[in-house]
Amino acid sequence: MARSLKKAPFVANHLLEKVERLNTQGDKKVIKTWSRSSTIVPLMIGHTIAVHNGREHIPVFITDQMVGHKLGEFAPTRTFRGHVKKDKKSKR
């Protein structure tokens, strides 16, 4: 279910403070975060945010097309190694 339009998008307070601080300084450092559920807002455009995927931090460069999506959408948690190929020779 989508979030109500009456409410503001969820962004973790600590993440929002770091982005605002870097915007005032004009700095473009990588921001590490575990907050996968935070929504990408226009303040974040141009920054690189390292999103935790359960094992490591995946750097995500924020563009204007990402606004409105969640940070966790861009850091996959599962690695797909492909399906097992059927081997007809071993069945004989």
UniProtKB/Swiss-Prot annotation:
Q: Which GO terms describe its molecular function?
A: rRNA binding; structural constituent of ribosome
Which InterPro entries does the protein's record reference? Ribosomal_uS19 (IPR002222), Ribosomal_uS19_bac-type (IPR005732), Ribosomal_uS19_CS (IPR020934), Ribosomal_uS19_SF (IPR023575)
Signal peptide (UniProt feature, chain positions): none
Q: Which of UniProt's keywords are assigned here?
A: Chloroplast, Plastid, Ribonucleoprotein, Ribosomal protein, RNA-binding, rRNA-binding
Give the source's domain of life in one word. Eukaryota
> Which cysteines link up through disulfide bonds?
none
Q: In terms of one coarse class, where is the protein primarily found?
A: plastid
The cellular component terms of Gene Ontology attached to this UniProt record, alphabetical and capped at eight, are:
chloroplast; mitochondrial small ribosomal subunit
Localisation: Plastid, Chloroplast
Set out the biological process GO terms recorded for this chain's protein: ribosomal small subunit assembly; translation
Family stated for the protein in its record: Belongs to the universal ribosomal protein uS19 family.
Q: Which HAMAP family match?
A: Ribosomal_uS19 (MF_00531)
What does the function comment of this entry state?
Answer: Protein S19 forms a complex with S13 that binds strongly to the 16S ribosomal RNA.
Q: What PANTHER family does its record include?
A: RIBOSOMAL PROTEIN S19P FAMILY MEMBER, SMALL RIBOSOMAL SUBUNIT PROTEIN US19M
Which protein, by its recorded name, is this?
A: Small ribosomal subunit protein uS19c
The record lists the organism as Chlorella vulgaris
